[in-house]
Amino acid sequence: MVVRPNVKELPGPKAKEVIERNFKYLAMTTQDPENLPIVIERGEGIRVYDVDGNVFYDFASGVGVINVGHSHPRVVEAIKKQAEKFTHYSLTDFFYENAIILAEKLIELAPGDIERKVVYGNSGAEANEAAMKLVKYGTGRKQFLAFYHAFHGRTQAVLSLTASKWVQQDGFFPTMPGVTHIPYPNPYRNTWGIDGYEEPDELTNRVLDFIEEYVFRHVPPHEIGAIFFEPIQGEGGYVVPPKGFFKALKKFADEYGILLADDEVQMGIGRTGKFWAIEHFGVEPDLIQFGKAIGGGLPLAGVIHRADITFDKPGRHATTFGGNPVAIAAGIEVVEIVKELLPHVQEVGDYLHKYLEEFKEKYEVIGDARGLGLAQAVEIVKSKETKEKYPELRDRIVKESAKRGLVLLGCGDNSIRFIPPLIVTKEEIDVAMEIFEEALKAALK
């Protein structure tokens, strides 16, 4: 039997009190008490229960972290067993086998068969920082390319890669020098006005031409160490590039000895129906940055990288808590669960996408529906003809959905992402889509 969402009052009295204290004592700048006043008390599977007894479907997965579901019994058991043994003994100076076991599993799952190593961290931002250091240290090249609308983190160095929203940069200039941004091949809306769904090769070629004709005018190719990219842009709007784009980019980069640094922090660990999102595109990246879902809710991240560009001398890189033994134990179990779930993710992902495509045909304000697996999104516009962005309506839809028990998150300027835990069933998707359509209608009034 499907347990449906049940919301009596949002926010309820207990939630209101917690939210008031939250803003008094915590320096938070990303929470949205107007549209998402949800104060979690516990989670189970795809459901979240708040402090006032309201029940929600979590189609945000804790911002892409809870891929195997809230409090998955196997993950909880792995955490308990490890916590009873020891909770910390830093990899900076000491050794424990589970850190090696997880690294072996991740390397085995990486595309291709080149020799690789893993360096651990705690967050996606840390993983991207480590990747930048690996590229600089391993190649001697000090400059990077990244994409407009990309998100790679908010710490000072990786903020130079991030180009998602100007508010993320406001007050922090100068960021690290040596990063040049290029257009991402967004099939729906791009600099050149190309319909990338109808002309994917043309869109791909325009991006490569931009690098060669404009970037290389002022950045020497031999000084560029890597191109940082997301196989599907996350915070930029869940944008899926043309199928052949990354193969073309890899061929182009190889001509100049430039590495590809694949940020899988949000799209990896089974989210798209493949363990790594880049597998959909048939490319073997030189570095794979991972995070979010790998720890099953605990802080864990890292970089899988070519062994020939690794840190090979003492003291070049370390982090006290990177590869924490409790998080590693959770990660080992997460990998096994996700491997079992991959066929299911492809099936229910297609099922969810069909709903979104139907909504696109039915409603003038849904300009695009896109995604792979359970990384899906719709883009909200004022009209299909003009494609004018409609962020105000997007926010109202998110608010109305939450009031009815469906937790959604925006992405990009005007899109909504649908990223439930990978264990979601078709019946639960039916309920969620019923709620979403009700919320959409209410927001349009």
Swiss-Prot record:
What is the pH dependence described in this protein's record? Optimum pH is 6.5.
Query: Organism classification, top ranks?
Result: Archaea, Methanobacteriati, Methanobacteriota, Thermococci, Thermococcales
* Keywords carried by this UniProt record: Amino-acid biosynthesis, Aminotransferase, Proline biosynthesis, Pyridoxal phosphate, Transferase
* Listed pathway(s): Amino-acid biosynthesis; L-proline biosynthesis; L-glutamate 5-semialdehyde from L-ornithine: step 1/1
**EC number(s) on record?**
2.6.1.13, 2.6.1.36
Gene3D superfamilies in the record: Aspartate Aminotransferase, domain 1, Type I PLP-dependent aspartate aminotransferase-like (Major domain)
- The secretion signal range is none
Q: What is this protein called?
A: Ornithine aminotransferase
Please indicate if the UniProt record lists Amino-acid biosynthesis as a keyword. Answer: yes
- How does activity behave across temperatures? Optimum temperature is 85 degrees Celsius.
